[in-house]
């Protein structure tokens, strides 16, 4: 009787282990093959100084990453399939290669990605309310002040290391823009700059001035309102640098 019970107990344990192992394998497969709606239901667009970039995640698993002229960004044309791992937040590309993409955050109409160590924010091109948020006249950036920026945003408020941002065409008088506000964190030793360029009416004579400002000066610029700027992020989705932007037209 004792032997029979021991044998049945061992058999039960073996079956339980097999079932558990299969469950873990299936769960892992499910995580790595996800195609979540926050990726597939949007037309993700990144405003870049040279060419706007579109990254596409199809419901069927198709992947593409290209510029305004349809040209691939970097070596992205080596990949045409993707899957999303919800545990690691990694977007795995196929065929396997060196390109690495990780989701750092996703909020309403905003997606922050780490692409091979280059952190970029993408906006939903289907969202008409924020369609006017692209930076303008970057051809005047003769000194490459904004080169490599991660996002272009309205800076709404600052409280210590907390900073509230929104799409650059933010309208504080429109209550529907409230849902686009996002509380973000400044990295330790974040830097701030004020960049202003003067252009004459012909658009030919351009004088550009970019100077570093203190955190106190930056806070005042934000509290005075109408603060818009280029933003850089690190791999923790923390803001490392802001270049506040403005322009004047001289007679």
Regions found by a protein language model. Give the residues of each.
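Bacterial N-terminal signal peptides that target proteins for export
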Residues: 4-15
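Hydrophobic membrane-insertion alpha-helices, especially the h-region
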Residues: 17-21
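C-terminal motif of bacterial Sec signal peptides marking the signal peptidase cleavage site
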Residues: 25-28
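N-terminal helix-cap/turn-to-beta initiation motif at the start of protein domains
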Residues: 30-45, 129-133
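Short, solvent-exposed coil/turn segments at beta-strand boundaries
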Residues: 37-43, 55-63, 86-88, 104-111, ...
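Contiguous, well-ordered beta-strand patches that form the walls/edges
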Residues: 48-53, 64-119, 176-191
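Solvent-exposed hydroxyl-ligand-binding patches built from regularly spaced Ser/Thr
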Residues: 68, 72-74, 133-251
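Edge beta-strand at a domain terminus
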Residues: 77-87, 114-135, 238-251
């Amino acid at each position: 009787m004792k032997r029979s019970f021991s044998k049945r107990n061992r058999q039960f344990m073996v079956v339980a282990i097999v079932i558990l192992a299969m469950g873990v394998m299936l769960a892992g497969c499910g995580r790595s093959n996800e195609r979540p709606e926050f990726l597939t239901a949007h037309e993700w667009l990144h405003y870049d100084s040279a060419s706007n970039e579109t990254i596409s995640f199809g419901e069927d698993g198709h992947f593409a990453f290209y510029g305004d002229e349809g040209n691939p960004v970097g070596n992205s044309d080596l990949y045409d399939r993707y899957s999303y791992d919800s545990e690691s937040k990694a977007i795995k590309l196929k065929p396997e290669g060196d390109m690495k993409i990780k989701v750092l955050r996703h909020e309403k109409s905003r997606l922050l990605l780490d692409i091979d160590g280059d952190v970029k924010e993408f906006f939903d091109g289907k969202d008409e309310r924020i369609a006017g948020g692209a930076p303008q006249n970057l051809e005047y950036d003769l000194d490459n002040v904004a080169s490599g920026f991660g996002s272009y945003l309205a800076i709404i408020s600052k409280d210590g290391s907390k900073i509230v941002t929104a799409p650059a065409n933010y309208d504080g008088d429109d209550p529907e823009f409230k849902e686009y506000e996002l509380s973000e964190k400044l990295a330790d030793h974040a830097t701030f700059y004020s960049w202003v360029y003067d252009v004459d009416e012909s658009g030919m004579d351009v004088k550009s001035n970019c100077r570093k400002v203190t955190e106190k000066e930056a806070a005042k610029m934000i509290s005075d309102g109408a603060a818009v700027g280029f933003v850089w992020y690190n791999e923790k989705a923390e803001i490392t640098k802001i270049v506040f932007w403005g322009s004047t037209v001289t007679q």
